[in-house]
């Protein structure tokens, strides 16, 4: 078994626990042992515009806790958390004075940031570390004939200067992950558009419009479902689908599903174990087509 430290963040265990449920079901079947981290905190992302150092420090602290396990790999499921950790690692590994300042504070907790971790997002972890052959061997119910649209989200592909999960202009890894399950990932012009979540508190109408226009475009494709991997994006498209539809004057009925839920269905895992009963969009239509 490949042992991997997993950072769940705040949103997943507090609100989007269907994501956690599905991840805990599918990873062991792929030969991955999940190591939960104790005493971790928020990644720091919400603090960036208020206190940049505090934001960076929280990411550094969480990575130091992960390093203390002795593991080499840290898996992050939230796009925003992944960007926060990646930015912190970049700055700490290139600025010795900043690193010393952070470590002097971490020392009070018996922690030290070393910069030794390989930071993964779910998408590149499954695509690059696990791979097609391993995933396909676990499938009991291939999704042949299913047509879906993918959503990468902004933070795992931008900024490209940090070395992100996939190409910022033409990402393919998530689409390939979908097609390894037997489904068809449909390309569309709005594929890289933002979900709007970052604007929800400051400019709610703009946020809902972003999500609504993208969902309206996806519905026009005639696909069977919409696949994502970020909890914040998922809340915009799944939990708030009625609201975003009303904002753009559209009645939306797009089934929205996490990739790990879709993978779990293809593995033959029971729907409830994957948290599919917690999805707010009309997921039954998608599940009926798979069955």
Region spans (language model):
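Iron-sulfur cluster-binding electron-transfer modules in prokaryotic oxidoreductases
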Residues: 1-291
């Amino acid at each position: 078994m490949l042992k991997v430290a997993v950072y769940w963040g705040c949103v997943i265990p507090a609100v989007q626990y269907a994501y956690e449920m599905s991840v805990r079901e599918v990873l062991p079947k792929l030969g991955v042992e999940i190591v939960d981290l104790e005493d971790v905190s928020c990644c720091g992302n919400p603090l960036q515009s208020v206190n940049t150092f505090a934001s960076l420090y929280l990411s550094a602290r969480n990575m130091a806790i992960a390093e203390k396990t002795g593991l080499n790999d840290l898996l992050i499921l939230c796009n925003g958390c992944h960007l926060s950790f990646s930015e912190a690692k970049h700055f700490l590994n290139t600025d010795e004075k900043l690193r010393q300042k952070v470590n002097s504070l971490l020392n009070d907790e018996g922690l030290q940031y070393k910069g030794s971790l390989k930071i993964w997002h779910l998408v590149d972890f499954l695509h690059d570390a696990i791979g097609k052959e391993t995933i396909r061997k676990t499938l009991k119910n291939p999704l042949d004939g299913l047509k879906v649209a993918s959503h990468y989200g902004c933070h795992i592909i931008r900024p490209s200067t940090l070395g992100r999960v996939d190409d910022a202009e033409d990402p393919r890894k998530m689409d390939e992950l979908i097609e390894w399950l037997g489904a068809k990932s449909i390309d569309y012009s709005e594929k890289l558009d933002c979900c709007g979540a970052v604007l929800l508190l400051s400019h709610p109408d703009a946020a809902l419009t972003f999500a609504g226009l993208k969902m309206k475009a996806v519905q026009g494709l005639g696909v069977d479902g919409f696949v994502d991997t970020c909890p914040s994006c998922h809340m915009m498209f799944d939990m708030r689908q009625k609201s975003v539809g009303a904002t753009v004057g559209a009645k939306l009925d797009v089934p929205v599903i996490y990739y790990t839920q879709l993978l779990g269905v293809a593995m033959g895992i029971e729907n409830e174990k994957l948290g599919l009963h917690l999805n707010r969009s009309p997921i039954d239509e998608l599940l009926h087509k798979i069955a």
